[in-house]
Design a protein with these regions (language model features):
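Short, low-complexity, Pro/Ser/Thr/Gly-rich segments in the mature regions of secreted, periplasmic
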Residues: 130-141
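C-terminal motif of bacterial Sec signal peptides marking the signal peptidase cleavage site
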Residues: 14-18
Length: 141
């Protein structure tokens, strides 16, 4: 009986010491669909979810940019930093070949050449980013 107790205790301790990296992004973590892209002044619409199918996926320190209407089905991955109300894209890679690309290559996804976004709104359901390229509104799905 004592050996069963020790075995159960060892199993419990092993289960509690998993090696998974913990998420540090809070509400930012997840899949985001672009619903509206407006100019920086807000006077005209550049794209909506009806004209473009742009998605951002956030996990750990990776940001994935994807346009589902792009027939080539390529996407880009980038490392990013999230601090308070700022999101900064640092290094970007083109998939499927993992080529390093300049940040201005991400302009079609709404990413500015300097990679810096201001987070205007962030909840578990909505995200609003602004930059010199415009204001991007997303919904979580």
């Amino acid at each position: 009986m004592k050996s069963i107790y020790i075995l159960l205790l060892l199993i419990a301790v092993t289960c509690m010491t998993a090696c998974n990296k913990m998420d540090e992004n809070g509400a930012l973590d997840g899949n985001w669909q672009l619903t509206e892209w407006r100019t920086a002044t807000g006077d005209s619409i550049i794209a909506t979810n009806h004209t473009r199918k742009i998605y951002y996926t956030v996990k750990y320190d990776i940001l994935k940019f994807q346009d589902m209407l792009d027939a080539s089905n390529y996407h880009c991955l980038a490392y990013f930093r999230h601090q308070a109300d700022t999101l900064v894209v640092e290094r970007a890679f083109s998939q499927p070949f993992d080529d390093v690309i300049p940040l201005d290559s991400l302009a079609n996804y709404g990413c500015p050449a300097n990679g810096r976004y201001l987070i205007r709104r962030l909840t578990h359901e909505h995200l609003v980013l602004s930059s010199d390229l415009g204001v991007l509104t997303f919904r979580k799905f």
